[in-house]
Amino acid sequence: MVPEYSRLYKILGYSFKNYTLLVRALTHRSKTKKNYERLEFLGDSILGFVIAEVLYMEFPDLAEGKLSQIRSKLVKGVTLANLALNFKLDEYIILGASEQGGHKREKILEDVFEAIIGAIYLDSDFATVKKVIVNWYKPVISTLNLDDVKVKDSKSKLQEILLQNGLSLPEYSIETIDGKDHEQEFTVKALSNDLNIEVRAKGTSRKKAEQKAAEKMIQILSQQGLHEKK
């Protein structure tokens, strides 16, 4: 029997012509090889571009650095997870037995949100998915407090410190992934070849582990007298 998705279509503001794309966007890898991972990859790129364009047009007087900070805030995990919960995507996510209980996990919600975007694009066209994304983000952008968007994330801050001092960017690599799918712990190594500095950090996602590793490297650079130039 075909699942009843009319309620979800109404929430999303989009009705799929090929509902199997939606099913795949909602399916975690623990369930089947035909899962949302490729759609997530596509949706992530589309979302980043659309939000960048919206911010460019909406805030013509903001500098590139500020625009980047705002975009980072709008496309990061917690924002996407909250939007996914608002859309009640957690009620539709398809998980395998090993992932049961993971419907409200931030990483899964974030991935499904991006996969939905990829699925809408393949089901329609770029103009359509852009319109859908803009409608989703209107209330978010309209309530933005630009003064609250001040702090760079650690990776961005580290990048600026290194570039300002004529040094190459660090290399990030995953060393280990431990635990079950819904309780994974990533160990990431950050390496600065120019300075011969190597640090490691753990996190519940690759992104979080990389941010922690970047923060560790910033602390080492600070001890060596390398700081971000204002």
UniProtKB/Swiss-Prot annotation:
Key words of the record: Cytoplasm, Endonuclease, Hydrolase, Magnesium, Metal-binding, mRNA processing, Nuclease, RNA-binding, rRNA processing, rRNA-binding, tRNA processing
Subcellular location: Cytoplasm
Ranges for domain DRBM: 153-223
Catalytic machinery residues: 44, 114
Entry-linked SUPFAM superfamilies: dsRNA-binding domain-like, RNase III domain-like
Cofactor (UniProt): Mg(2+)
Coiled coil: none
GO molecular function term, any single one: metal ion binding
Family: Belongs to the ribonuclease III family.
Entry protein name: Ribonuclease 3
Binding-site positions, Mg(2+): 40, 111, 114
Catalytic activity: Endonucleolytic cleavage to 5'-phosphomonoester
Gene that this sequence comes from: rnc
Top-level enzyme category: hydrolase
Residue ranges annotated for the RNase III domain, each copy included: 5-125
EC number: 3.1.26.3
InterPro entries hit by this protein: dsRBD_dom, RNase_III, RNase_III_dom, RNase_III_sf
Any Gene Ontology biological process: mRNA processing
